[in-house]
């Protein structure tokens, strides 16, 4: 119940539900963590702190508990305090990308030059133009037909509750497994870009991203997002998979305000003057 209330934006009701559950069941790691997460969402960071500590002490191998406590330390202006927990998280899952995102942020906030080593934007960020699939006279014609088909897949009218989409819709399932010829043609062009990207990456056996470079790859997730007026993505990290990419199929006329540009480096933690956009790319 509390999870549904929280997903629907009923934070106060969800807090009351969890407090009632604690009174009935007693203190558990799960309930204390959930209550702490909701209090942190409301900005009551001091109240969330001991609840997260209790959860971690009760279940020290729970990565979610550790990561949320790391986030709390950063929000409270003490990024250096979180390094021990980051080390613990990496010991549990050495390649967890959310953990590395926090590590990079802590390095940046504490002035550690390892941030530039981890986030080498000039090396890791690339933009490509998709090749024209066979049977199409131009890329614009292909994109027009693909956009029309993708729009037909957006049968839901509300934004997903547990995703980064704000004022838009997202398709369900794995898009690139759709057998429609347009989707498969797009997948072929996309794979050409991925292949080019991987060929350009340097070899580095100790870097958490480059050390996972392999001979082949598979797509672990894919979807279509259709944004409405003023629609956007909230800042987020992809914790699963290894490499992320996005393709812009149809975009409105661009203004001079950088509206719709994809940003890198800025967090969702509302860090005020500590926020920083490292790079932005126009679709």
Task: Name the predicted role of every residue range.
Residues 26-27, 60, 93-95:
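Short coil turns that delineate tetratricopeptide repeat
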Residues 117-211, 232:
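Non-heme Fe(II)/2-oxoglutarate
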Residues 177-191, 195-283:
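Catalytic core of non-heme Fe(II) oxygenases with the double-stranded beta-helix
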């Amino acid at each position: 119940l509390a999870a549904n209330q929280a997903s629907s934006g009923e934070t106060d009701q969800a807090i009351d539900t969890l407090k009632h559950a604690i009174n009935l069941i007693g203190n558990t790691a799960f309930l204390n963590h959930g209550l702490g997460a909701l209090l942190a969402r409301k900005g009551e960071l001091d109240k969330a702190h001991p609840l997260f500590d209790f959860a971690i002490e009760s279940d020290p191998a729970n990565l979610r508990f550790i990561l949320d406590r790391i986030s709390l330390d950063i929000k409270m202006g003490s990024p250096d305090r979180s390094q021990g927990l980051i080390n613990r998280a990496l010991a549990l899952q050495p390649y967890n990308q959310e953990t590395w995102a926090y590590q990079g942020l802590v390095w940046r906030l504490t002035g550690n030059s390892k941030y530039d080593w981890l986030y080498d934007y000039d090396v890791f960020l690339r933009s490509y133009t998709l090749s024209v699939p066979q049977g199409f006279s131009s890329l614009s014609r292909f994109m027009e037909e693909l956009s029309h088909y993708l729009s037909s897949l957006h049968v839901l009218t509300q934004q997903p509750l547990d995703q980064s989409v704000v004022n838009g819709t997202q398709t369900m399932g794995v898009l690139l497994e759709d057998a429609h010829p347009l989707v498969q043609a797009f997948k072929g062009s996309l794979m050409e870009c991925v292949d080019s990207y991987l060929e350009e990456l340097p070899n580095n056996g100790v870097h958490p991203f480059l050390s996972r470079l392999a001979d082949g790859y598979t797509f672990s997730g894919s979807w279509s997002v259709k944004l409405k007026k003023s629609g956007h993505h909230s800042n987020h990290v992809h914790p699963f998979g290894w490499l992320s990419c996005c393709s812009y199929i149809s975009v409105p006329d661009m203004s001079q305000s950088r509206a719709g540009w994809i940003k890198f480096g800025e967090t969702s933690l509302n860090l005020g003057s500590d926020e920083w956009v490292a790079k932005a790319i126009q679709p």
